[in-house]
């Protein structure tokens, strides 16, 4: 998840019915630099997912459904009006 402060950037949200699998601790909300570039790292290996935001680990979760997943990687923006998202320097590496 990438969202404004207070909305769990770095957490894992599944939009196909399960909702939040894991949200970030409140004390990590200030790691997000609003209005500036942020660096997000996502590592998925088997059923383990780890996320980092600006070098700080945000979550680490094991989930069988994620581990069974196959397919494509997509970048998604939800409706909400007035949101502008930019991506740069995307890198994907096979583990």
Map each language-model feature to its residues:
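Carbohydrate-interacting regions of secretory-pathway proteins
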Residues: 1-95
């Amino acid at each position: 998840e990438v969202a404004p402060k207070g909305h769990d950037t770095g957490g894992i949200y599944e939009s196909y019915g399960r909702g939040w699998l894991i949200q970030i601790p409140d004390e990590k909300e200030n790691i997000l630099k609003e209005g500036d570039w942020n660096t997000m790292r996502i590592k998925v290996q088997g059923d383990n997912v780890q996320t980092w935001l600006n070098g700080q680990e945000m979550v680490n979760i094991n989930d069988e459904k994620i581990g069974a997943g196959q397919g494509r990687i997509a970048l998604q923006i939800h409706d909400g009006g007035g949101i502008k998202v930019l991506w740069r320097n995307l890198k994907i590496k096979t583990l």
